[in-house]
UniProtKB/Swiss-Prot annotation:
Organism listed in the record: Arabidopsis thaliana (Mouse-ear cress)
Family matches, as Pfam families: WRKY
Protein name: WRKY transcription factor 8
DNA-binding segment(s): 177-242
Keyword Transcription on entry: yes
């Protein structure tokens, strides 16, 4: 068996090869091959496939290669196109033409084919990528937005410059004193000091400690007359003068209109003042300037509450203040 020479061209195929013969009107009739002489029985027509097939007979191996050679590539098969006449999107619309050349030798055939895919009507549009348009539009927007931001920043800078140009009114006072910082009723905080040209005396800067008050002042001693202090105020106070509680209560009061029973400060004095103290300590207390009128207490003698307060006053203050005038 091993020394026998088989002639492939004259080899007769068995009837088992008949499974390629499919009797269907809608499908392609493949040839029934029983040997080389019977190969030209049924050929694939070009109208059924859509390609120009060679008219010459091929061997089974050539037909097998022909079947794979005619298959379009994936990029050609799935090239979409637009049917303008019907208005439908056809993903399989292509026109192909095949130029085949047959080289026959020992029952083998080689086919070289060219497949031409017709350009779709929207090929120019396909070459035009939408990403490029979006990139250009984005650049235009960035340029436009950047220009608007620049204009806004310029406007803000202009408004700031205008606000800086508006200077607050200044008032200067010249006072002959040995004290550099004079008391004016307001509370100040020193935030800087600067040397003055052609003057041995520095200039001090103060700011009002009240919230939301922008008043500033600067104090400097005149180099021409060292006894003169120049105080310059900038802006105006938007709040009243912060005064002390005791000075506010006793400013403008006299002994005739002072009522010890109705004053809350006087009751606080009775509660919080210690019982034992010297006469020197009494004169240091601001309440020592109060002069109690004895006739007033005689008029209020009928009220027990006022009598008790009067007794406490006798215990706290010396008897000198309660002597009746002749």
């Amino acid at each position: 068996m091993s020394h026998e020479i088989k002639d492939l061209n004259n080899y007769h195929y068995t009837s088992s090869y008949n499974h390629y013969n499919i009797n269907n009107q809608n499908m392609i009739n493949l040839p029934y091959v029983s040997g080389p002489s019977a190969y030209n029985a049924n050929m694939i027509s070009s109208s059924q496939v859509g390609f120009d097939l060679p008219s010459k007979n091929l061997s089974p191996q050539g037909a097998f290669e022909l079947g794979f050679e005619l298959s379009p590539s994936s990029s050609d098969f799935f090239n979409p196109s637009l049917d303008q006449e019907n208005g439908l999107y056809n993903a399989y619309n292509y026109n192909s033409s095949q130029k085949s050349h047959e080289v026959v030798g020992d029952g083998c055939a080689t086919i070289k084919s060219e497949v031409r895919v017709s350009a779709s009507p929207s090929s120019s549009e396909a070459d035009h990528h939408p990403g490029e348009d979006s990139g250009k539009i984005r650049k235009k927007r960035e340029v436009r937005d950047g220009g608007e931001d620049d204009q806004r920043s310029q406007k803000v800078v202009k408004t700031k410059k205008k606000e800086e140009k508006k200077k607050e009114p200044r008032v200067s006072f010249m006072t002959k004193t040995e004290v550099d910082h004079l008391e004016d009723g307001y509370r100040w905080r020193k935030y800087g000091q600067k040397a003055v040209k052609n003057s041995p005396y520095p200039r001090s800067y103060y700011r009002c400690t009240t919230q939301k008050c922008n008043v500033k002042k600067r104090v400097e001693r005149s180099y021409q007359d060292p006894t003169v202090v120049i105080t310059t105020y900038e802006s105006q106070h938007n709040h009243p003068i912060p005064t002390n509680r005791r000075t506010a209560m006793f400013s403008g009061t006299t002994a005739s209109d002072y009522n010890p029973s109705s004053s809350p400060i006087f009751s606080d004095l009775i509660i919080n003042t210690p019982r034992s103290f010297s006469n020197d300590d009494l004169f240091r207390v601001p309440y020592a300037s109060v002069n109690v009128n004895p006739s007033y207490h005689q008029q209020q003698h009928g009220f027990h509450q006022q009598e008790s307060e009067f007794e406490l006053l006798k215990e706290m203050f010396p008897s000198v203040f309660f002597k009746q005038e002749p």
